[in-house]
């Protein structure tokens, strides 16, 4: 059997160009036509895409801040003011966790997503994994991101 040879680019979404600390599903992503992506779950310890807190959830780092500006729940100035680290070509996961988390919480507080029928339907359809995941991540946040074996009783 003769196989056709081909070539491509392996590009982590996080490596796409972005002024907001990490590549995401914004216009820059659409500029790449044929590409394979690494796992896109929320990264765990060591920020590896292969060590995720969920097999089903998406990584919130990949939410396009430009789309949130277009929706009116963030401003371009808020995004520009955020400190994602000093080097534009290096992902600073510590700053990313702080700044993108802050911006995403701010966007959520300004949104009416709770009244969005598509969002409500998504939550209902996926509650078999989403409820436990949301609870786990909320408790993890309460314990400052520590591993669950270090949580207080």
Enumerate the predicted regions with their spans.
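Acidic/aromatic-lined carbohydrate-recognition and catalytic surfaces
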Residues: 2-153
């Amino acid at each position: 059997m003769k196989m056709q040879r081909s070539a491509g680019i392996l590009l982590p979404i996080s490596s796409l160009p972005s002024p907001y600390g990490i590549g995401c599903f914004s216009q820059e992503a659409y500029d790449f036509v044929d590409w394979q992506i690494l796992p896109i779950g929320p990264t765990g310890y060591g920020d590896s895409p292969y060590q995720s807190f969920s097999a089903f959830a998406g990584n919130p780092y990949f939410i396009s801040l430009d789309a949130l500006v277009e929706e009116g729940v963030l401003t371009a100035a808020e995004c520009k003011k955020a400190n994602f680290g000093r080097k534009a070509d290096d992902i600073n996961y510590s700053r990313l966790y702080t700044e993108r988390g802050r911006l995403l919480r701010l966007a959520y507080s300004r949104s009416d997503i709770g009244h969005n029928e598509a969002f409500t339907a998504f939550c209902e359809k996926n509650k078999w994994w989403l409820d436990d995941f949301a609870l786990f991540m909320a408790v993890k946040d309460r314990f400052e991101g520590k591993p669950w074996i270090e949580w207080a009783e």
